[in-house]
Structures are given as C-alpha cells and as structure tokens.
C-alpha cells in the first residue's frame, strides 16, 4: 500500500510522465544495432552523432576529428554541431535495451544519451536506474534525508570497511532502501489520511509551495510534529494574503509551531517532510479559497508581466522612431549644407575671375545674393513637405549634388491617362513611395530632371571654355543705342558665365548716364545707390515699351537677312504687332510696370535680348504654326504676353529665338546657352509650385525646350572641335525627355488651359471595334509588314495599347500637333509594354523598330518645312539596327531616357548617313 502511495505521489508532484519508447538492440560485429531497422543503413544509427555534412546527406559518418573521412575526400568543411534535444512537454524518451546472446536483457538507457541530457536527469531517473540494475522495483521514491534514531544506529553499526568497499551505485541503492523503510514506518505511525486519497492527491501542488522544514535531528522533528498536531484542531480563520513568492504567501499563517523560513530554495530533499505532514494539507472550503487566490495571484503576475513587456516594447519603438527621424533630419541638413557650400564655392570662383567691368561684377553679386534666399526657401519647402514626398525630395537633393543613387533613368514616364512610373519601379529596385502619382511627386521628378539638364549644360560650357578659351571680339555683335544718339559696345559674352545671363543691366546704365558726373565703374556707386539701379531698370522698361509702341528697332545689328522676303506679309505682321502693342499699352497700368521692374531682377534683359524678342515676334512664331504645333493665336498673341509674367518662359522663348537667328547670324551661340540655363534654373523653382495660373506657362516652356533641343540636335555652331551650344550628338534625346517631365508634372491639364487638347491620347473608340466572337480588335490595320504577324491583336495581348496608339499616329499623320505626338510617344508607353521592352522582348523590339521608321520618315519628309527638324534628320541613322552594340535595344534605351547621358554607350556621330 505504501509503495503504491509513493508512486501516486511521485506522479502528482513531478513533471508529466514522458512516453517511453523501447528500442531493442543486438550486437553485430561488436556494434549495437536496432533489430527493427531496415534498408541499407541497418547496421548504423544514421550518423546521429556524425558531422553536419553526413547528417544532411544521410550517410554514415566515421565521426573522425577534426574532420571525418567523407568530408576530407569531398574537400568539405567538417563541422560537428552539438545535439540539442527538444524539451517539449510529453516528449518521447527513447530507452535502449540490449539483448545478449544468452537471452538476458541489459538496460542502456543512459549509454547513448548526450552529456547534456545526462546532466538534466532528475534524481528519480537515477534511482530508477539503480534499482533496475539490482533487480528491484521501478517504483522507488526518495524521501527526506532525516531518518529515525534506530535507523541511524543501524547504519553506524555497519563495518567501516564495507562502506569503503561500496560502489556509488550500491551506495545509492542502499540509501534508497533505507529511505523506503523510513517512509513505510512514517506512514504506518501517522497515516490518518490515506496517501492515495483525493485530499492528499489534490494537495500535491500546494504542498510544493509550502516553506521547507530544516533538516535536523529526530528529536526536534518529533517536537515540531506534536505542536502542529495540536494546532490542527483549531479553526484557521485568518485570511491568506497574496505575496510575491510562495514562501511569503504560506509564511503568513500565524502558527505557533511553524518553522522559520530557510534562506535556500526549495528542493525535493529538504521539503518532502514538510510536504507530507498531515496538518499542512488543507481541506474543504479553505482549500478551495486558497486555490482560487493562488490562481488570481498567478493571473495578476502574468498581467503585470505583460504590461511591463508592452511598455518596454512601446518605449523601444518610440526610441527607434526618434532615431530614424533624427537620422533623416541630420541627412537632410547635411545635404542642404553641402549644397549651400557648393553654391558658395561657385560664387567665390566667379568673383575671382578677371572682369574689366566692375559694375557688371557688382550686378552679378547682387543677383546671386538674391538667389541665395530663394534657394534657402526651396530647401525649407523640401524640409516641410509631407512624408509621401520625403524620399523623392532627398533623392532630388542628392542628384543636385552630383551623388546619383539611381542606376537607371531618373525621369518618370506618363502612361495612358497620366499614370506615373519609371524604370526603377519596373525592375523592382525602387523603394515604394506612398501616393507616388501625386502632384508633389511629379513636380519633384520634373525639378530633378531640370537639375540634371542644367548640370549637363554647365559642364558642357565649362569644357568649351577649357578647350577653346573665350570668344574673340569679332564673334560678338556691337549694337548701337539709337535712342541716346551714341554708340557703345556691349560686354563681350564669356563662356564661364553659364549660370548668370550675359551683358548685365549695369552696362545699359552706363550708356544712359554717360553725361552724368557719377562714375558707374565705382563699386560704391553701384552698391549703395539703389535708386540709380531702379532708374536704369525703369529706363529699360520704358525702352521696351517704346519699342513695342513705335515698332522701331532700338538695336542695330549687322544681319544678313534674306532678300526674297514678302513685303506684303511683313507689313501685315508689323500691323498686327502694332495693334497688340497698343492693346497692351492701354491695358497696362502703373501696377504692371512695377511688376515688370520686380520680375526684371530675376532675369536681366539687355539690347541683345530685345532683338531676340523682336525676332520671335516677327520671324519665329510663324515657323511654329507652320509645323502645326497649335494655332497662331497661341504663339503669336498669348505666349509673348504670358512671357512678361513668367521669366522662365521669357528665357525659353529667347533661347529658341537665338537658335533660329544663329542660323543666319554669328556670335549668338553663347546667348542660346545662357538663356537655356536661366530657363532651366527658373523652371526648377516653378515646378515645385504648380498652380492653375502657371500651368500654361510651364507647358509652353516645355514645348519650346523640346523644339529647341530638336533644333540643336546636330550641334551646328562649332569652334574648333566643340559645339558652342553645348549639345552633344545624343544629348537631344536627354533634353527632350527632360522637358517631357514638365508635361507629366502638370498632367492632366484643366479645360481652361490653352493647351488642353495638346498631345492628348483618346483610345475610348477602341470599345466600338472589339469583336466579341474572336476576342480581337479587327479595326487595327497593320501599317508595317515587319509586324504583320502580330495582327489581329487579341484583347489580352500586351501590345494592344501600344499598337492602338501607333495606329492612331499613322492615321493622324497629317493632322495638327502630330510632331509633338510622335516625339512624345515614349512618354506615353504602356507600363506592361515598357516592361517587356526593358526585358528584351522580341515583339516589343519589333514594334519600336516600326515606330522608329515612322519617326525617321516623318522627320525626313517635313525637314524642309520645319527648320528645327533639320538637325534630327542628321543624327538619326537610316536603320535602327545600325546602332553599335545591339541595335534597336540601345536606340530605344537612348530614346526612352534610360540613364542618358551616363548609361548610354551610343554615339550618333559614329554613324555615316
């Protein structure tokens, strides 16, 4: 009875019993193998202690150190990873039993276990092993180390030499037998409650939480037992208080015979006696309350622990978020400081350059000082932008500093309907930005593209200066001031003045104040006399107004005009300009003049600029309408008037006019470059503040820059081996693509815009030609035999939208705005088709070759009528496959703006036409 009680109590207080799996082993050739194993690996244990390579290959390992033979033969790195058995609840315990030749069974439960498992074996397992080895029962259970007086006397009477000769196993077995006898005697004397009764079994868990009794002699133990028996009859009315530890909890009972708490932790050896005391076992309602309080206490501790963990996690997240924000702010500050330092270095370099005209130097410095706050304001606007555009602005700042973090094109393309995407997104190397199709993101991309274009022009201008030096005096025109009755030579254009405009107003000021006593060459007179500068600007405004009212040229230049001009058409044009000037002079008041004076400080206009503006109003705009780029009311009336409100449009207009005039006049190449740079610089600021008011000005500037880039594609004006207009043979693609980003930024246009219908794509009529029976579009007619096998086009074809747009281009070849539609086709590519093209799809490449033939044929056909297409026809080869290193793929990557000018290896000048 006592042995059964000990076994039941052992099951109650120990961990849940693990399942045992007995594996019977036999000896074969001196090795122990399992009798149930099958297959070719029957006579080994599948390298359970072998190296990692043999375990992975499931082959036998000789377990050689430092490297096994198989790893040595295969030249592999041999590693031995320690075995970590899973300590899961209810795990299976494998017990190996060896059957000898005589039929007897030998237990090997601890032979094959790793050292870490042997250390984790409980005292119960040690006792069981010892008892099994001696043929005893497996149901032994260790009790307290304290024994009765009679037992201690019997142990002391044993011979000393027997103790010395005992092995550790026999000593453990003897101690177990003695403890077993002591437990039998104890329960026979104090067995008021059956050991297997429900009261005793249910109290097993709480018994572990009771404070242990210190081990001592048997007399003290009996005294404590008697005192506790006396206290058992008294009702326990005192409530139990919850505490942090079980010792504090159960130590709160005010019992006279309660032993003092010990400093060491509880163990089986020092707490078993106190656990088995009868008076320590609660019963009835008190026991239920104790269990409930204990459960509530455990839940409270668990909740507190979860709250502490949650607070720590939230604190860690806040710290990480603060660190990320701080790092981003530091990076932006570093970018801003580095950018400002570069600007300061540019200012210092320009101040150190020799300049004979001190007034011009002072005017340049004043202009750059005014540009400083504007650049700071732009940086502050970037810092105050929302989180959706933070990464785009940061990349824009990096690009302005020359730190390119992108391996492909920096310009997004506008898909059908104005959907913004780029090559990084297609190739999966771009971090997604929230609301990537927002107006702010498009504006940032356009500003970045304009910054790259401006940087490209500045580098080209600097290279021209290094290789060819400054232009000679004979290259610059010498205008005369008819209004003042005297002549003065304008300041010679310098290639180093790439960012600032040429011929500052201070030179005109000296012409107008030649008879005055104040010397304009004195720096103090230029810096301190602000009113004098305002007067000079006002004189310039009056001069402009007088030129428009009287239609008399104020600048006399040596020009070689064509002699076959139609006098009647010229007089009609003059009358129209006079009428427009009269209307503007009547409607313009004092406020408009003040506005012109304020805007003139951003872009200085000299007499050469007046000539260029007059040339546009008389000669250039008819060529634009002849190319069917919108109607005459836009380019003749609307654009010149709008240019006085937006300096970036004025500079773009003057650059295009200078390009047209440079075909017949020399010495204007530097003016083309300077006005183009000023237009790009001011456009970078304007695209960050897109509104409905400046939309038309931005679109007009983009269209003019596209036409100017096409006109300068061949790089006609050259000195030595360098192009004076700073355009490389393949750079026109780069600038056409960059200017197209402005159209992407302002897309979609408002219906009140003058350019509402320009380069629009309407594919809504495709729904009327769909054949539902065969699932194809039968109205799309093949216009190129090289892609005839792609027709009819299925509804699920990835080429559907692209072929539909090409079909509309082919049909509308003779309609208006076709030139802009055909050159902006890459900006309207379907996203799916663009992905196929970037991955080298043959069908997509064939379609782009067909488009190239359409582009080449149109440019060749109209080059005699449209002057700014003459340069394009000179750089486009006859066949797209003439490109070196891959043919059409390189050409289309160039035209799509895939990293130009850094990525492209194509040089158009290498091809002979």
From Swiss-Prot:
<dbReference type="GO" id="GO:0005737">
    <property type="term" value="C:cytoplasm"/>
</dbReference>
<dbReference type="GO" id="GO:2000911">
    <property type="term" value="P:positive regulation of sterol import"/>
</dbReference>
<feature type="coiled-coil region">
    <location>
        <begin position="303"/>
        <end position="346"/>
    </location>
</feature>
<feature type="region of interest" description="Disordered">
    <location>
        <begin position="552"/>
        <end position="571"/>
    </location>
</feature>
<dbReference type="GO" id="GO:0070452">
    <property type="term" value="P:positive regulation of ergosterol biosynthetic process"/>
</dbReference>
<feature type="modified residue" description="Phosphothreonine">
    <location>
        <position position="122"/>
    </location>
</feature>
<feature type="region of interest" description="Disordered">
    <location>
        <begin position="453"/>
        <end position="489"/>
    </location>
</feature>
<keyword id="KW-0804">Transcription</keyword>
<keyword id="KW-0539">Nucleus</keyword>
<feature type="compositionally biased region" description="Low complexity">
    <location>
        <begin position="222"/>
        <end position="241"/>
    </location>
</feature>
<keyword id="KW-0175">Coiled coil</keyword>
<dbReference type="InterPro" id="IPR021858">
    <property type="entry name" value="Fun_TF"/>
</dbReference>
<feature type="compositionally biased region" description="Polar residues">
    <location>
        <begin position="469"/>
        <end position="487"/>
    </location>
</feature>
<feature type="modified residue" description="Phosphoserine">
    <location>
        <position position="519"/>
    </location>
</feature>
<keyword id="KW-0479">Metal-binding</keyword>
<dbReference type="InterPro" id="IPR036864">
    <property type="entry name" value="Zn2-C6_fun-type_DNA-bd_sf"/>
</dbReference>
<feature type="region of interest" description="Disordered">
    <location>
        <begin position="216"/>
        <end position="258"/>
    </location>
</feature>
<keyword id="KW-0597">Phosphoprotein</keyword>
<keyword id="KW-0805">Transcription regulation</keyword>
<dbReference type="GO" id="GO:1900436">
    <property type="term" value="P:positive regulation of filamentous growth of a population of unicellular organisms in response to starvation"/>
</dbReference>
<dbReference type="Pfam" id="PF11951">
    <property type="entry name" value="Fungal_trans_2"/>
</dbReference>
<feature type="region of interest" description="Disordered">
    <location>
        <begin position="103"/>
        <end position="173"/>
    </location>
</feature>
<feature type="compositionally biased region" description="Polar residues">
    <location>
        <begin position="552"/>
        <end position="562"/>
    </location>
</feature>
<dbReference type="GO" id="GO:0048471">
    <property type="term" value="C:perinuclear region of cytoplasm"/>
</dbReference>
<feature type="compositionally biased region" description="Polar residues">
    <location>
        <begin position="374"/>
        <end position="385"/>
    </location>
</feature>
<dbReference type="InterPro" id="IPR053157">
    <property type="entry name" value="Sterol_Uptake_Regulator"/>
</dbReference>
<protein>
    <recommendedName>
        <fullName>Sterol uptake control protein 2</fullName>
    </recommendedName>
</protein>
<dbReference type="InterPro" id="IPR001138">
    <property type="entry name" value="Zn2Cys6_DnaBD"/>
</dbReference>
<dbReference type="GO" id="GO:0000978">
    <property type="term" value="F:RNA polymerase II cis-regulatory region sequence-specific DNA binding"/>
</dbReference>
<dbReference type="GO" id="GO:0005634">
    <property type="term" value="C:nucleus"/>
</dbReference>
<feature type="region of interest" description="Disordered">
    <location>
        <begin position="347"/>
        <end position="385"/>
    </location>
</feature>
<dbReference type="GO" id="GO:0001228">
    <property type="term" value="F:DNA-binding transcription activator activity, RNA polymerase II-specific"/>
</dbReference>
<comment type="function">
    <text>Transcription factor that is involved in activation of anaerobic genes such as DAN/TIR cell wall mannoprotein genes and YML083c. Appears to bind to anaerobic response elements (AR1) with the consensus sequence 5'-TCGTTYAG-3' present in the promoter regions of DAN/TIR genes. Involved in sterol uptake and regulation of the sterol biosynthesis. Binds to sterol regulatory elements (SRE) with the consensus sequence 5'-TCGTATA-3' present in ERG2 and ERG3 promoters. May be involved in down-regulation of CWP2 during anaerobic adaptation.</text>
</comment>
<keyword id="KW-0010">Activator</keyword>
<feature type="coiled-coil region">
    <location>
        <begin position="440"/>
        <end position="472"/>
    </location>
</feature>
<dbReference type="GO" id="GO:0008270">
    <property type="term" value="F:zinc ion binding"/>
</dbReference>
<keyword id="KW-0238">DNA-binding</keyword>
<feature type="compositionally biased region" description="Basic and acidic residues">
    <location>
        <begin position="454"/>
        <end position="468"/>
    </location>
</feature>
<keyword id="KW-0862">Zinc</keyword>
<feature type="compositionally biased region" description="Basic and acidic residues">
    <location>
        <begin position="150"/>
        <end position="164"/>
    </location>
</feature>
<dbReference type="GO" id="GO:0071456">
    <property type="term" value="P:cellular response to hypoxia"/>
</dbReference>
<dbReference type="GO" id="GO:0045944">
    <property type="term" value="P:positive regulation of transcription by RNA polymerase II"/>
</dbReference>
